[in-house]
């Protein structure tokens, strides 16, 4: 299609008004004059909710790349100091000069002077290395505080998919096994250790394999039935190791973090694919695009065995081992929101791109989604009149917006697999809720440190707080009980937590004793709570740097408890 020039068209019309204009030219002119086509004014209103999931993903991708970069930069960083340092080049030059001096064997250069010079250079290098290690240790500690989750410092890890695969495995496995071709599974996992797999996945595959094997044995020789069923079960269980059953395209984190042993039957193919960067990228691209699997026979037979191995490189293992705390995302978002206008102005000044933070959309019509022919007819009828891409939205469901033509199958896949969408939206909702808990955790630790350094609040301040304290604002994040126990523990968080637990136990015991008649369950709960209270009181006497170990000894046919303490590794 030739490039459309409206100035040239206008000039031709003015020079020769009788000239006919082609339909193609009129169509292009229509698109230029009305790029966002509006069809008819309808009184109906569609209510929509929009969540920018792509922005959330990009932020996490940037965070991942940023963490990988700063830790890698720390490994390669060599600090510079005010005094001159011996680089490799200057050190070699000085040593060569000393060697030449020794060869001359003149009386002008005493051997003691040469030795002292060498020792001086060695001491300088040793001092520089020690300072470098100390500086790197300090920076590494700082980076880990902000970018590596620590349950003692942070409220929650940014990684929340740990339990997803386990919880959905049992439900999904039955449908996976039911549609699996037995012959394919048997050949794919022929080298799987059947005994290990059977022991590991017996509870998961028992009911599934029982029904599958029953139908298989009906038309199979009895002697071969057992072998077929065992190999089928082994194949199904082996495949679930490498993929998240709820989201098959995602490589589970535990696979990404560990070094995988390449099976012997795959070693030759893996070596050939990873021999060059071009081959590796091509294979990775094919694995990420299902429609290309037919080009690679071996990958098509068992793609889940190839994909985690190819993507399980030193870089991905390194990145997956540095999981940031959710606190960092919260602080980062708070920084962006608090300095948004300044960041926007600076970004527009530095880069040529313009911000794309607001969205405008139009609803053209409503078509019965059950009639796919009507949906297609609408698209192909108006696609040439509309300058922008057309997206179809399923009413009453969350819908991912994308190109109708180019990415239709891709978006239909996500729209139909609601578990993937649910996981994303649940995470988005969880991110909105976690801010208060992170702020509360930060205030709790800072208040504990303040009590350790300056002591408890003055009595007058406590009276004022008890009079004017409300549940709104920062003060409302910590309860009076928590503040009281922090002061009682002199800022020791471990003891303060024990005091909180003791208060809860005493309150529960008080409620149970206030009842006239206790049920058997309530009596058991009362006994259990009293034991927990006694244990908590004993734990108050355990020093912070020790671990308590309860030992039971036989004393004249009577068991008695002895308490031992061992040094804790801090």
From Swiss-Prot:
<feature type="repeat" description="19">
    <location>
        <begin position="233"/>
        <end position="236"/>
    </location>
</feature>
<feature type="region of interest" description="20 X 4 AA tandem repeats of [CNS]-[ATV]-[DNS]-T">
    <location>
        <begin position="161"/>
        <end position="240"/>
    </location>
</feature>
<feature type="repeat" description="18">
    <location>
        <begin position="229"/>
        <end position="232"/>
    </location>
</feature>
<feature type="repeat" description="17">
    <location>
        <begin position="225"/>
        <end position="228"/>
    </location>
</feature>
<feature type="repeat" description="12">
    <location>
        <begin position="205"/>
        <end position="208"/>
    </location>
</feature>
<feature type="repeat" description="8">
    <location>
        <begin position="189"/>
        <end position="192"/>
    </location>
</feature>
<keyword id="KW-0677">Repeat</keyword>
<feature type="repeat" description="1">
    <location>
        <begin position="161"/>
        <end position="164"/>
    </location>
</feature>
<keyword id="KW-0426">Late protein</keyword>
<comment type="similarity">
    <text>Belongs to the asfivirus B602L family.</text>
</comment>
<dbReference type="GO" id="GO:0030430">
    <property type="term" value="C:host cell cytoplasm"/>
</dbReference>
<feature type="repeat" description="5">
    <location>
        <begin position="177"/>
        <end position="180"/>
    </location>
</feature>
<feature type="repeat" description="14">
    <location>
        <begin position="213"/>
        <end position="216"/>
    </location>
</feature>
<feature type="repeat" description="6">
    <location>
        <begin position="181"/>
        <end position="184"/>
    </location>
</feature>
<feature type="repeat" description="15">
    <location>
        <begin position="217"/>
        <end position="220"/>
    </location>
</feature>
<feature type="repeat" description="3">
    <location>
        <begin position="169"/>
        <end position="172"/>
    </location>
</feature>
<feature type="repeat" description="4">
    <location>
        <begin position="173"/>
        <end position="176"/>
    </location>
</feature>
<feature type="repeat" description="11">
    <location>
        <begin position="201"/>
        <end position="204"/>
    </location>
</feature>
<feature type="repeat" description="7">
    <location>
        <begin position="185"/>
        <end position="188"/>
    </location>
</feature>
<feature type="repeat" description="2">
    <location>
        <begin position="165"/>
        <end position="168"/>
    </location>
</feature>
<feature type="repeat" description="16">
    <location>
        <begin position="221"/>
        <end position="224"/>
    </location>
</feature>
<feature type="repeat" description="20">
    <location>
        <begin position="237"/>
        <end position="240"/>
    </location>
</feature>
<keyword id="KW-1035">Host cytoplasm</keyword>
<feature type="repeat" description="9">
    <location>
        <begin position="193"/>
        <end position="196"/>
    </location>
</feature>
<feature type="repeat" description="13">
    <location>
        <begin position="209"/>
        <end position="212"/>
    </location>
</feature>
<protein>
    <recommendedName>
        <fullName>Protein B602L</fullName>
    </recommendedName>
</protein>
<feature type="repeat" description="10">
    <location>
        <begin position="197"/>
        <end position="200"/>
    </location>
</feature>
<comment type="function">
    <text>Plays an essential role in the assembly of the icosahedral capsid of the virus. Allows the assembly of 3 molecules of hexon protein p72 and formation of a thermostable trimer.</text>
</comment>
